[in-house]
Regions:
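Short, structured beta-strand/loop micro-motifs enriched in basic residues and often containing a Trp
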Residues: 202-207, 405-411, 594-600
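Short tryptophan-centered beta-strand motifs in secreted/extracellular beta-sheet-rich domains
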Residues: 222-228, 424-430, 613-619
C-alpha cells in the first residue's frame, strides 16, 4: 500500500522532469531525521470526496426483511460513479473466497446442499473448522447452514464466477413449480459456491425476491446473473433473474438478494485489546485456522474498523483514517499467525498473511509482463507488512485521526515465479516503532513465498500522520525546485517521441492496456541522461475521476506510489520495444529481473486536484546476456513544483517466454 503515481487515457499534456540524489533508500536514516523530513513532505490538500462511498454500510448487521414488490430497473448496473468502463474491472472486482471445479449440480448435489453438505459438494476449498472452547476440540463450522431448500430445483448448469465488471457470474436452473422459489435457491447456491459463508463460523442465508413476479411460465428454465456481490457490511449478493433465457426486463424477470447473516451471539471480529479467537471458521491454505479473514480485510478497507480490528478501532469508521486499499488494489486476504500484543511495539512481532492470486485477475489481463506486474509485488508485501503493525495500535493513543503513508524501502526479487493461481505466503516482522506528537513511524522486514519457496523480500518504513503534520509538503529537496535533466541543458537536445497510445492493443503482448494503461507517450533523448545511455521523460494529466482514487483509499484518495513505479517501468518497456530489444526472440516477455535490489523513497503524494505529474528516467545500465536483456535505471517523479518520488535501480528484463 503505497502512495502516488499516474495513469493514462486520452491526450496528455507534456512538460519536463529533473535529476535526483543517488542516496540508497534502503539505508534508513536516523528516525529523528526521517521524521523531520517526512513531516514536511506531505500536503493536507486531500479532498474528502467519497467517490468510493457506494459501499456505504447498511443500517446494522441484520437488515430488515425485504419484500417482493415494485422494482426500479436501471438502464445500467450501478457502479462507482467516477469509473471509466475500461477500468471497471480494476475497481469493481470481487475475488471468490473459494473456487470449485464444479460447474454442474445434479438433483442429488442440491439435496446434499439442503442438508448442509457444502464441502461435500464443492470440495475441500469450502472446508471450515472452528474450536469448541469448552473442550478445545476442532469442530465443523457452519454445520447448520443449509441452502437451496425453497424450490424444487432439478439441476444447475453453467455455474461460473467472474471477478470483475458489471457481471460477477451466474448459472442456469431447471426447476419445477415456483420460479421465484427456484431463483432464491439458485442465488443461495451461488453464494456458497463463491464462499460468502466462509466469513463466519455460524450463519444463515436469507434470500428475498424483488420486483414483479412473473406469471407461471411454460418453460421450467431460468438464468441468474449476479450484478452485485460484496462482504460489507455482511456478505451479500444481488442477482437478476430471467425466465426461459430471455434478458431481464420490466415484463420478464426480477431480482433476488441473499444475505449471509451471523446467528445470534456469533462474534464477527476481534475482542477488546485485539483478542483473537478461533471463531472465524476460515481455513488458511496451510490448513490452519485463519485469525482474520477476507471479511475483516474488507471492513478495514471501507467498512467498520471495529469489526476488523476490535472495538477500540470503531472510532475510525467513517473517518479519513488508516485503511487498506479496496477493490482490485486490495491484495491481502487472511492473517494466519500473529505473535504480537496490542500496545506492545517492541521489535520482533512476527505475523504471516496470505494472498490468493487469481488466475483471471484484472492486472494479468492488463499488464505487459509475462506474469504479475511489479506493482502487485509491492502492494501485496507492503499491505501485509503494515496490516498487523496497525493492529498493534500505534494510533490509538492519539486524539487525532492518523493516516498512513509509505515512506520508502528496498526490495529484491530472488526467484522468478509464475504467481497465477497461487497463494502467496507473506511473512512480516516489526523492526521498530517510534511514537511522536502528531505522527509515528514503523519499519518492517518482509518476505514472500509460494509453496515454501521465497521469491521476494525487502524492508520498508511507514508513517502515520495527522492532518496538521501533513500540512507542509516540501518533497525530496526541502521545498526547493529541482529541475529535470532537460532543464539543466544549455541547448535543447534532439527529442523523439514514442506514441504509446497509437500502438496500444490487447492483442499486443508487450503493451499495457485497460486500467494499467498508465503511459500515452514517452519523450526520448538517445544517449542522454545522467549516465549517457538514454533519457526518458513523460508528463501526464491527473484527473479527479481516475480509477485508482476509487480504490486508494476510501475517504482519503491518493495515487498508489506503486503505480508511480509502474509508470516508470512502462516507460522503460516502451523504450525497449521501440529500440528493438525484443526482436531477437520468438515469444518475448517482460519480467522483473532476479537479484537486482530496488530502492524507493516517497516524500509526498499525488491527490485528485494536483492537475498533472511528471517523470524522468535515466538509463543506467544495459546488461545483455544470451537469453535476456536487463535495463537498470534511476527515476524521479514530480507533482507541480515538487519532486516527491525517487527510484534507484528500477529494472526491467526482456527475455524469451518461459
Amino acid at each position: 500500500m503505497v502512495e502516488a503515481a499516474p495513469r493514462s487515457a486520452g491526450n496528455r499534456t507534456r512538460e519536463s522532469l529533473a535529476p535526483r540524489e543517488t542516496v540508497p533508500v534502503g539505508a534508513m536514516a536516523p528516525l529523528a531525521a526521517v521524521r523531520d523530513s517526512v513531516v514536511r513532505a506531505h500536503q493536507a490538500t486531500i479532498a474528502a470526496a467519497s467517490a468510493v462511498a457506494r459501499a456505504t454500510l447498511r443500517d446494522g448487521l441484520n437488515p430488515a426483511p425485504r419484500q417482493l414488490g415494485e422494482k426500479t430497473w436501471p438502464e445500467t448496473v450501478d457502479t462507482f460513479s467516477t469509473t471509466r468502463a475500461a477500468e471497471l474491472a480494476a475497481v469493481r472486482c470481487f475475488r471468490p473466497l473459494a473456487r470449485s471445479a464444479k460447474r454442474e449440480l445434479s438433483s442429488e448435489d442440491i439435496d446434499v446442499l439442503t442438508r448442509g453438505g457444502i464441502e461435500q459438494v464443492f470440495g475441500p476449498t469450502h472446508r471450515q473448522t472452528a474450536t469448541d472452547h469448552a473442550t478445545g476440540r476442532t469442530i465443523a463450522a457452519n454445520s447448520m447452514l443449509t441452502v437451496a431448500s425453497h424450490g424444487q430445483v432439478e439441476s444447475i448448469e453453467g455455474l461460473e464466477s467472474s471477478p470483475r465488471g458489471a457481471d460477477f457470474g451466474g448459472l442456469t436452473v431447471r426447476y419445477n413449480g415456483d420460479p421465484v422459489a427456484a431463483a432464491r435457491s439458485a442465488a443461495e447456491v451461488f453464494g456458497v459456491f463463491v464462499g460468502l459463508h466462509l466469513c463466519m463460523s455460524d450463519c444463515v442465508a436469507e434470500s428475498q425476491a424483488h420486483g414483479t413476479a412473473p406469471n407461471p411460465p411454460s418453460s421450467q428454465r431460468l438464468s441468474l446473473r449476479v450484478v452485485e456481490i460484496d462482504l460489507v457490511p455482511i456478505p451479500h449478493l444481488r442477482a437478476r433473474v430471467s425466465i426461459d433465457g430471455l434478458e431481464p426486463s420490466r415484463d420478464n424477470g426480477f431480482d433476488v438478494t441473499v444475505d449471509f447473516i451471523p446467528r445470534n451471539g456469533v462474534p464477527l471480529g476481534p475482542g477488546t485489546n485485539g483478542h483473537l479467537q478461533d471463531w472465524t471458521g476460515r481455513v488458511a491454505t496451510t490448513g490452519r485456522q485463519a485469525l482474520l479473514s477476507e471479511f475483516h480485510m474488507a471492513h478495514l478497507a471501507r467498512g467498520d474498523q471495529g469489526i476488523a480490528f476490535g472495538p477500540e478501532f470503531s472510532r475510525y469508521t467513517g473517518n479519513r483514517a488508516t485503511r487498506l486499499p479496496t477493490g482490485g488494489l486490495l491484495l491481502v486476504d487472511r492473517v494466519t499467525e500473529f505473535s504480537g500484543t496490542r500496545g506492545n511495539w517492541d521489535a520482533g512481532a512476527d505475523y504471516r498473511t496470505e494472498y490468493d492470486v487469481p488466475a483471471d485477475a484484472w492486472y494479468l489481463e492488463d499488464t505487459a509482463n509475462g506474469s504479475v506486474p511489479h506493482f502487485v509485488y509491492m502492494e501485496t508485501s507492503l499491505q501485509a507488512a503494515l496490516l498487523m503493525g496497525y493492529y498493534l495500535g500505534p494510533t490509538l493513543g492519539s486524539t487525532e485521526t492518523l493516516r498512513l503513508r509509505n515512506l520508502g524501502g528496498t526490495a529484491t526479487v530472488s526467484r522468478r515465479l509464475d504467481l497465477r493461481g497461487k497463494t502467496v505466503d507473506q511473512s512480516s516482522t516489526l523492526v521498530s516503532t517510534t511514537l511522536m506528537p502528531g505522527s509515528s513511524l514503523q519499519s518492517f522486514d518482509y518476505s514472500l513465498r509460494v509453496d515454501g519457496d521465497e521469491f521476494y523480500s525487502g524492508t520498508t518504513m511507514f508513517g502515520y500522520f495527522s492532518d496538521s503534520a501533513l500540512d507542509n509538503q516540501t518533497g525530496l529537496d526541502a521545498g526547493r525546485h529541482r529541475p529535470n535533466w532537460l532543464e539543466t541543458l544549455e541547448s535543447a537536445p534532439q527529442i523523439r517521441t514514442i506514441d504509446v497510445a497509437a500502438r496500444r492493443d490487447r492483442r499486443e503482448p508487450l503493451c499495457c492496456t485497460g486500467a494499467l494503461a498508465l503511459v500515452d507517450h514517452v519523450d526520448v533523448v538517445d544517449g542522454g541522461g545522467q549516465y549517457g545511455k538514454g533519457y526518458l521523460h513523460m508528463t501526464r494529466d491527473i484527473e479527479a475521476d481516475e480509477w485508482f482514487f476509487d480504490c486508494h483509499f476510501y475517504l482519503d484518495p491518493v495515487i498508489p506510489g506503486s503505480l508511480g513505479v509502474e509508470s516508470v517501468i512502462q516507460c522503460i518497456q516502451e523504450w525497449m520495444v521501440d529500440v528493438g530489444m525484443h526482436r531477437q526472440w520468438r515469444d518475448p516477455q517482460f519480467h522483473i529481473p532476479e537479484n537486482v535490489p530496488f530502492n524507493w523513497k516517497y516524500r509526498g503524494q499525488f491527490v485528485p486536484d494536483d492537475g498533472h505529474c511528471e517523470l524522468e528516467v535515466h538509463v543506467k545500465d544495459i546488461r545483455t546476456q544470451a537469453d535476456s536483456v536487463v535495463v537498470v535505471a534511476d527515476a524521479s517523479l514530480w507533482k507541480p513544483g515538487l519532486r516527491i518520488y525517487e527510484l534507484i535501480d528500477i529494472s526491467v528484463e526482456l527475455r524469451e517466454g518461459i
